[in-house]
Amino acid sequence: MSRQTTIPLRERNIILIGFMGAGKTTIGQLVAKKLYRDFIDVDAEIERRQGMSIPELFAQKGEAYFRKVERELIVDLCTNTRLKILSLGGGAYLQEDVRRACLAHGIVFFLDLSWEHWKEERLPLIVDSRPVLKNKTLEEVEQLFFQRQSAYALHHSRVVLNELEAEQAAEQIVESIKWTWDVYEPNR
């Protein structure tokens, strides 16, 4: 598929962004099931292709290498695939090339939640599994959370997750997508 090709809305990949631990993978799997699409967790795909976990990749090859692999994969998926649900790692969308490809070729949903909710509900579940959090104080993690918000603000739609269960968030995304299809491509 050429970069100049305009992808019909109904065929565009649906891309989920947000801070680590927001629930992108869980919600993405639910959305994929509801829309009968394939689901791709970008971090899991990187692990599969590299033959090692993300923490191992960070330790052995460094963050710069990981970000390069991540960027190349996401840009390729955005420009050369259709009808997928993509879940991006929390830091992926900070890269300009990734943002540009996602916004141009997909429908980007920001899965948002407050710092307080994330700190109380999500941090305890993920703190040991995320290389970016390793050896960071709570204040440093909070700073990282708020630094990323400006990149996440560049999206097509936002879902606030604070009080939503994953199923409710997925349903909200699906309803939003279907409404968009009906309004902008009613005869397809």
Swiss-Prot record:
A Gene Ontology cellular-component term: cytosol
Gene3D superfamilies found in the cross-reference section: P-loop containing nucleotide triphosphate hydrolases
One function term, GO molecular function aspect: magnesium ion binding
GO biological process terms held by the UniProt record: amino acid biosynthetic process; aromatic amino acid family biosynthetic process; chorismate biosynthetic process
EC number in record: 2.7.1.71
Pathway(s) where this gene product acts: Metabolic intermediate biosynthesis; chorismate biosynthesis; chorismate from D-erythrose 4-phosphate and phosphoenolpyruvate: step 5/7
Cofactor annotation remark: Binds 1 Mg(2+) ion per subunit.
Keyword terms, alphabetized: Amino-acid biosynthesis, Aromatic amino acid biosynthesis, ATP-binding, Cytoplasm, Kinase, Magnesium, Metal-binding, Nucleotide-binding, Transferase
Family affiliation: Belongs to the shikimate kinase family.
Protein name stated in the entry: Shikimate kinase
